[in-house]
Amino acid sequence: MVTIKSKREIELMREACRVTALTHKAIEEAIKPGMTTADIDRIAEQTMKKYGAISAEKGYDPGIRGVPPYPASTCISINDEVIHGVPSNKRIIKDGDIVSVDLVALKNGYNGDAARTYMVGNVSKDAKRLVEVTKQAFFEGIKYAKKGNRIGDISHAIGEYVRTQGYSVVREFQGHGIGKEMHEDPGIPNYGKAGKGIRLEPGMTLAIEPMVIQGKPDILELEDGWTIITEDGSLAAHYENTILITEKEPEVLTIL
């Protein structure tokens, strides 16, 4: 069921989303070659704590037999890893890596979700273009995140923009509603038909998240039960924000 947030709930969402944005700011300022993904995870956890929040991801139970609850405060995915990479003291970030960090701050019972792909050191032109296209895909999508439009309008805009740039969108994972729960209705694919899906109403809070692959759209899951990689080894990028549907233009809650 899609939830329409009250004025009070929207204020609580803004608070949680501000923590998410501040946490990404701390990561952006700190990330460099030689750090481990666990180092980044610790920075995120400490920053969320500083602002009165906790990670909604840590301890998350996917409800899949044999897959343990998620062990970290962030998902950190490097190069050909698309999403859900598990931070590790053994995983060292190198010059030229693109590093996707997805995090959800939980504060006062509400969630703020955002992902960024960070370019570390001397990144190739191809990698830089992928990251830039992925970010722009988000902004192409939210042009249609307006009262009276439909979910499919957002999905179509993202998918078509990515296609025209010569890349592929991930089809098995998607954006989602967000609020008291990290994942709420509706699902928001990164491809689809304009004019389809539920109508957008003021008070909806949505996590829009293009996940873009340089090569073919096929993906694989690693044995850890979490990490998703590209099947062909090509690079992947991820850009996400939590937005609010209003009477006019959408409000992006996870950008400072």
Residue map of PLM features:
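Active-site neighborhoods and metal-handling regions in enzymes and metal-associated proteins
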Residues: M1-L256
